[in-house]
Amino acid sequence: MDYFTLFGLPARYQLDTQALSLRFQDLQRQYHPDKFASGSQAEQLAAVQQSATINQAWQTLRHPLMRAEYLLSLHGFDLASEQHTVRDTAFLMEQLELREELDEIEQAKDEARLESFIKRVKKMFDTRHQLMVEQLDNETWDAAADTVRKLRFLDKLRSSAEQLEEKLLDF
């Protein structure tokens, strides 16, 4: 059973996050291993396994990029383990330049420039994210998979920039 079905939700990117949360709580109560403490060993094991599946489904569906990757996996794109990389050389060059800029900001310990950099990367991420949503809604799976690969780069860059921000603020 796929994670969307487990949660009683349609298999699409845009979800009702409140319904997702409520269903998670219901499933957790229903399959909590403590409820099966007096059951047979097989029942206890099944409850632990079901609870683990519910937790994994929850983590996957509530995180936007993980949810997109999972939805794509249902359509034959295994982005989590694939060896495909982004082949868009202009995008890759831009990423290299952004990484170099982040390194320069770190060397200079320039908080103002870092703040501007983070905003710029967030805007780039948001723009691509919106494109991905449209591609998933339109079921253009190849294009959506390519956009998700690019979003991974931007997500890692944003994370690195935010870590640098924490590091600079700790000084």
Curated annotation (Swiss-Prot):
<dbReference type="InterPro" id="IPR036386">
    <property type="entry name" value="HscB_C_sf"/>
</dbReference>
<dbReference type="GO" id="GO:0051259">
    <property type="term" value="P:protein complex oligomerization"/>
</dbReference>
<dbReference type="InterPro" id="IPR004640">
    <property type="entry name" value="HscB"/>
</dbReference>
<comment type="subunit">
    <text>Interacts with HscA and stimulates its ATPase activity. Interacts with IscU.</text>
</comment>
<dbReference type="GO" id="GO:0044571">
    <property type="term" value="P:[2Fe-2S] cluster assembly"/>
</dbReference>
<dbReference type="GO" id="GO:0006457">
    <property type="term" value="P:protein folding"/>
</dbReference>
<comment type="similarity">
    <text>Belongs to the HscB family.</text>
</comment>
<dbReference type="InterPro" id="IPR009073">
    <property type="entry name" value="HscB_oligo_C"/>
</dbReference>
<feature type="domain" description="J">
    <location>
        <begin position="2"/>
        <end position="74"/>
    </location>
</feature>
<dbReference type="GO" id="GO:0001671">
    <property type="term" value="F:ATPase activator activity"/>
</dbReference>
<keyword id="KW-0143">Chaperone</keyword>
<protein>
    <recommendedName>
        <fullName>Co-chaperone protein HscB</fullName>
    </recommendedName>
</protein>
<dbReference type="GO" id="GO:0005829">
    <property type="term" value="C:cytosol"/>
</dbReference>
<dbReference type="InterPro" id="IPR036869">
    <property type="entry name" value="J_dom_sf"/>
</dbReference>
<dbReference type="GO" id="GO:0051087">
    <property type="term" value="F:protein-folding chaperone binding"/>
</dbReference>
<dbReference type="InterPro" id="IPR001623">
    <property type="entry name" value="DnaJ_domain"/>
</dbReference>
<dbReference type="GO" id="GO:1990230">
    <property type="term" value="C:iron-sulfur cluster transfer complex"/>
</dbReference>
<comment type="function">
    <text>Co-chaperone involved in the maturation of iron-sulfur cluster-containing proteins. Seems to help targeting proteins to be folded toward HscA.</text>
</comment>
<dbReference type="Pfam" id="PF07743">
    <property type="entry name" value="HSCB_C"/>
</dbReference>
